[in-house]
């Protein structure tokens, strides 16, 4: 439990930008979002095409 708590703390601190040298989280998060949206749209379109066929 202690290890999980420590990992959560470090993860949140990194995400909030407390340790910016380790990982710039906001930039990676903003870059990742459009890709996920496009993938979701492609999946929805593929499913709709399968249903129409």
From Swiss-Prot:
Q: Which residues cross the membrane?
A: 7-23
Q: Among its keywords, does the record have Transmembrane?
A: yes
Q: Which domain of life is it from?
A: Eukaryota
Keywords (A to Z) from UniProt: Differentiation, Membrane, Mitochondrion, Mitochondrion outer membrane, Spermatogenesis, Transmembrane, Transmembrane helix
GO cellular component terms listed in the entry, alphabetical order: mitochondrial outer membrane
Mitochondrial intermembrane side residue ranges read 1-6
Miscellaneous: Isoform Kastor and isoform Polluks are conserved only in mammals.
Q: Which organism is it from?
A: Mus musculus
Record protein name field: Mitochondrial sheath formation-associated protein
Share an example GO biological-process annotation for this protein: cell differentiation
**The keyword Mitochondrion appears for this protein:** yes
Stretches of the chain found on the membrane's Cytoplasmic side: 24-53
């Amino acid at each position: 439990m202690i290890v999980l708590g420590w990992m959560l703390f470090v993860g949140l601190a990194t995400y909030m930008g407390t340790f910016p040298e380790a990982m710039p989280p906001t930039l990676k998060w903003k870059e990742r979002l459009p890709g996920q949206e496009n993938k979701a749209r492609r999946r929805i379109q593929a499913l709709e095409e399968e249903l129409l066929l």
